[in-house]
A protein has these predicted regions:
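Short helix-loop capping/hinge motifs at secondary-structure junctions, enriched
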Residues: 1-3, 19, 47, 62, ...
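Bilobed periplasmic-binding protein-like "clamshell/Venus-flytrap" ligand-binding domains
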Residues: 17-30, 168-179, 266-277
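C-terminal lobe and pocket-closing loops
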Residues: 106-118, 131-237, 275-276
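Glycine-centered hinge/linker elements that transmit conformational signals in sensory
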Residues: 10-16, 52-83, 123, 127-130
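Extracytoplasmic/periplasmic solute-binding protein
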Residues: 7-55, 61-62, 98
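Short, well-structured alpha-helical segments that form the helix of a local strand-helix-strand
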Residues: 10-14, 93, 253-265
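Paired acidic/hydrophobic, glycine-rich loop segments that form the ligand-binding mouth/hinge
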Residues: 99-104, 123
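Short helix-initiation/N-cap motifs at beta->coil->alpha
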Residues: 4-11, 80-95
């Protein structure tokens, strides 16, 4: 069984925690917590900014997402999620003492190598959504960026290389064990077939969900671009801090969202003045 909605996660949390296998969603100043909690926001249709780069964090959808996350923590998780690092959820999964984490496939790939019997009992699922499916694309993770220096003497050749690199990702997908998904649909024409039969997985079609991952995944800064302001918000961990304030009971969800807006507004104002939004 896998959770389809955040309500599923909320209902299951107390039972799983009572069994000694709590949920494991980081609420710490850490990259993985950023990815997880920004994805949770998107699940509810909440965003940091709109398509034009305007700050939109203080919305009812954000408050709802924060309330749900706080409830999930209080009933299904333990205090250590507030101090997690980038490997904490991996360790919880590998220990066999956690029931759910939010991470890339690298987490289960490690377990497949270290403990195949445990890996066979771990399922994969898309990022949960709301009952109404309000969020559309909801999962975010690392998006690679390549640049060409202005002083380069081989700019045309560099552009051709980057185009070829982006449009031929089959070997990259295979060598990364399905961790590095293609940036464009036709970069791996047989993506569905490749992830439908995985020799390392039990069952072999465990990674089938990756075939349509582009339909429920998006970039940091969605629905806008990953601009300087969004990355400042990311690097200062303002989203995890917002969730943590509510989960710890230091603020209500409404207060936590309003405080986050107050922290983010100067960042957006600064970068807009610099012409970076």
């Amino acid at each position: 069984l896998v959770p389809r909605t955040w309500d599923d996660v909320l209902r299951a949390g107390p039972k799983l925690k009572a069994m000694g296998t709590p949920l494991g969603i980081g609420i710490s100043p850490d990259g993985d917590s950023n990815y997880s909690l920004m994805s949770l926001l998107h699940s509810y249709g909440a965003t940091i900014q709109d398509e034009g780069g305007n700050l939109t964090i203080n919305r009812p959808a954000t408050v709802e997402a924060v309330k749900v996350a706080a409830a999930i923590f209080k009933t299904g998780m333990t205090e250590d999620v507030f101090v997690w690092d980038g490997y904490s959820n991996n360790r919880l999964l590998a220990s066999g003492k956690g029931s759910l984490i939010l991470n890339a496939v690298s987490a289960i790939r490690a377990v497949e190598t270290q403990n195949p019997a445990l890996a066979a009992n771990i399922a994969l699922a898309p990022m949960p959504t709301t009952a109404a499916g309000a969020g559309g694309p909801r999962a975010i993770y690392v998006v690679g960026v390549n640049v060409i220096w202005k002083f380069s003497q081989n700019q045309d050749l560099a552009r051709r290389f980057l185009v070829d690199l982006a449009l031929d990702q089959r070997e990259t997908l295979q060598r990364s064990l399905s961790y590095n998904l293609p940036p464009y649909e036709h970069a791996v024409p047989d993506l569905a077939a490749l992830v439908d039969k995985d020799d390392r997985a039990q069952p072999p079609d465990k990674y089938r969900i990756l075939a349509d991952a582009p339909s429920w995944s998006t970039n940091i800064g969605h629905p806008g671009h990953a601009n300087a302001a969004v990355m400042d918000v990311f690097n200062q961990f303002l989203v995890p801090k917002m969730f943590a304030a509510a989960a710890r009971g230091e603020m209500s969800a409404e207060q936590a969202v309003k405080a986050a807006e107050a922290q983010m507004k100067p960042i957006f104002d600064h970068w807009r003045e610099q012409g970076k939004i």
